[in-house]
């Protein structure tokens, strides 16, 4: 396991959520709030970076007031209520994904299409909505997703156990398709990812890679991992992420992010 150089002039800490910052029960550890308070007291920005919806992340971190958030796998970046960056999918591509998912009900597929503040679904059975709820708190049921008006920035498909790669392969669409979890496949414009979003935020704030710490565990974190000098893969990370990161943090079940940050705040070179 590794630590951050105690002499590093860190200005930004970006954390993936599931499998990284959240504990084994998918919750924010109680002791996290004290660590974040210490970061903020030093002028260090704490930035959740997730496939989750902006509204969901804002509610989860409401105790911190207005903070910067990278949401929807990097398709939107907010600093408080100010939009720093977003990337909108062509409506024709949205309809292509809707049709593709409808054709693959053998994979128990359910689609969420994501606007900046609201997500939309045309399937509302209990099983699917339970899967959607942790990630999309502002969600609206519609009879036909193809009738939704307004900008769409990401689409997320929920599938059954062991079927994410089958779904990803089945989405023959003019978009970037990313496996973002054990039951989730995301589709967004090519070249859009958490790394691009982090870069936009760094530029806006005048923060360099050397002043940035990133924690991640899954392939949708890869580009973000590459955008920071202090890039940490969790001990439970996917092999691709472990290979790309410069350092390793203890597993999320051991509150690894907090261990590394606490060591830095206390000026320790060992966990």
What are these model-predicted stretches?
Residues 41-47, 65-67, 153-155, 210-212, ...:
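Short active-site oxyanion
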Residues 24-128:
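Active-site phosphate-binding/coordination module
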Residues 19, 39, 50, 73, ...:
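Residue-level signal for inorganic ion chemistry
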Residues 66-73, 87, 132-133, 177-180, ...:
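Short hydrophobic/aromatic-enriched beta-strand-loop microsegments
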Residues 63-65, 73, 170-174, 227-228, ...:
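Short, structured coil segments at secondary-structure junctions
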Residues 9-25:
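Asp-based phosphoryl-transfer active-site loop
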């Amino acid at each position: 396991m590794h630590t951050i150089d105690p002499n590093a002039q860190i200005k930004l800490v970006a954390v993936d959520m599931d499998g990284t910052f959240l504990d084994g029960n998918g919750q924010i550890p109680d002791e996290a709030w004290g660590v974040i308070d210490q970061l903020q007291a030093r002028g260090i920005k704490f930035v959740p970076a997730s496939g989750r919806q902006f509204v969901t992340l804002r509610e989860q971190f409401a105790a911190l007031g207005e903070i910067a958030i990278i949401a929807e796998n990097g398709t939107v970046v907010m600093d408080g209520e100010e939009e720093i960056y977003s990337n909108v999918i062509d409506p024709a591509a949205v309809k292509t994904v809707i049709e593709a998912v409808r054709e693959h009900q053998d994979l128990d597929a359910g689609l969420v299409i994501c606007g900046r503040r609201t997500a939309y679904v045309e399937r509302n059975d209990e099983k699917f909505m339970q899967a959607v709820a942790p990630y999309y708190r502002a969600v609206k049921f519609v009879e036909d997703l193809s009738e939704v008006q307004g900008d769409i920035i990401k689409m997320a498909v929920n599938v059954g156990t062991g079927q994410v790669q089958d779904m990803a392969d089945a989405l023959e669409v003019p978009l970037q398709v990313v496996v973002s979890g054990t039951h989730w496949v995301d589709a967004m414009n090519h070249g859009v990812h958490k790394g691009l979003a982090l870069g936009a935020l760094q530029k806006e704030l005048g923060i360099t890679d050397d002043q940035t710490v990133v924690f991640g565990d899954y392939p949708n974190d890869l580009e973000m991992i590459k955008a920071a000098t202090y890039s940490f893969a969790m001990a439970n990370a996917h092999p691709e992420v472990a290979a790309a990161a410069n350092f390793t943090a203890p597993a999320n079940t051991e509150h690894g992010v907090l261990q590394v940050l606490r060591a830095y705040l206390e000026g320790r070179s060992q966990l």
